[in-house]
């Protein structure tokens, strides 16, 4: 089941972020501040369903009473200075135990939230991914199936 997150979900959502981190390219060199994760998620859940700058959508995938995935999206001013808003994803993560369609269903929930907001134009709804987690190409294909197109690249400095 996909649903909006509640405050009681935060401890498990912190664990999900830690699981994502452990599978990421950052795991060997960057630790996780559970306090920062908790604070971030608490703020996001507080603003869950918001329709103004800083508003969020926080969705979870739940199976047999256990959270197996999360999605966090946020509203910001277009180009950070615009008089309209854009929707951006912050986190999308599902465990191997999640349902096959959970990621897709959480994205659908994000799109419904963004599309219902008259301050957000359709072309200002964004989805992103990087090579931080394995399976990036699969995520890109899912986004394309949802009607999204590539809109640039992210570059990072090479380690020395």
PLM region spans:
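Conserved GNAT-fold acetyl-CoA-binding loop/helix
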Residues: 21-43
């Amino acid at each position: 089941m996909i649903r909006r997150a509640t405050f009681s979900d935060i401890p498990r959502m912190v664990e999900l972020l830690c699981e994502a981190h452990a599978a990421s390219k950052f795991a060997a060199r960057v630790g996780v501040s559970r306090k920062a994760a908790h604070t971030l998620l608490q703020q996001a859940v507080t603003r869950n369903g918001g329709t103004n700058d800083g508003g969020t959508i926080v969705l979870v995938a739940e199976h047999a009473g256990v959270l197996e995935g999360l999605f966090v999206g946020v509203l910001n001013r277009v180009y950070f200075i615009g008089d309209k808003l854009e929707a951006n994803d912050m986190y999308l993560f599902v465990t191997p135990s999640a349902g096959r369609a959970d990621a897709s269903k959480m994205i659908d929930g994000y799109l419904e939230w963004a599309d219902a907001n008259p301050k957000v134009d359709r072309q200002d709804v964004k989805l992103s991914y990087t090579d931080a987690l394995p399976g990036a190409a699969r995520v890109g294909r899912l986004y394309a199936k949802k009607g999204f197109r590539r809109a640039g690249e992210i570059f990072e400095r090479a380690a020395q």
